[in-house]
Structure formats: C-alpha cells, structure tokens
Amino acid sequence: MDRFAISATLEARPGKESEVEEFLKSAQPSAIQEVGTTTWFAFRIGPATFGIFDTFANEAGLQAHLNGAIAKALFAKAEELFAKPPQIQQVEIFAAKPLS
C-alpha cells in the first residue's frame, strides 16, 4: 500500500478555467512516465477549483515527483493560470482499499 501522497488545490483565474483543465490533462503523460508515481488524479472540485491527488510507495518517489516535470510546469504557469498560489500538502496514507 502506498503511504505517501500529495493533495493539491488549484484556483483558476477568472476566464482561465478551460486552460487549467487542459494544462492538467496535458500533464497526464508525464505522470504516467514517472516510475515512482503510483497513482495520479486531476479533477474539478467546483467551477474554478481543481485538484490533483497522487500517491507514491516511498519518499524517493514523492521527492522525484516534487522535483519533476509536472511540478516545474505547474509553478511556471502559476501566475498566468491561478488566482492564488497552488495549495500543496504532503499527505500520509494510513488506510486504503486495494486496487484490484
């Protein structure tokens, strides 16, 4: 079971909601290529609020992701796309339903 995760909340600038969604969709291939990233989800919470949730088997995978292409692109586009800085939290997973 993965024990490490990141939960991020992103608030799109007014009129940038579609661009944020497309940006997140464009990150999927990078997430797939990250060996240490077990799961990666991008989702919409509300009209202008988006989220990312990803999991890692170990600290090394988490750190590789935080220093990887998605994180770099996210912060490079932050001022253009987001109303406020992305809210990123490291999360400890202590229980989960196994994937079948």
Walk through the language-model features, giving the residues of each.
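Short coil/turn motifs at secondary-structure junctions
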Residues: 13-15, 45, 57-59
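Intrinsically disordered, low-complexity acidic/polar segments
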Residues: 17-19, 61, 97-100
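An amphipathic, aromatic/His-enriched active-site/gating alpha helix that lines ligand/cofactor pockets
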Residues: 26-39, 55-89
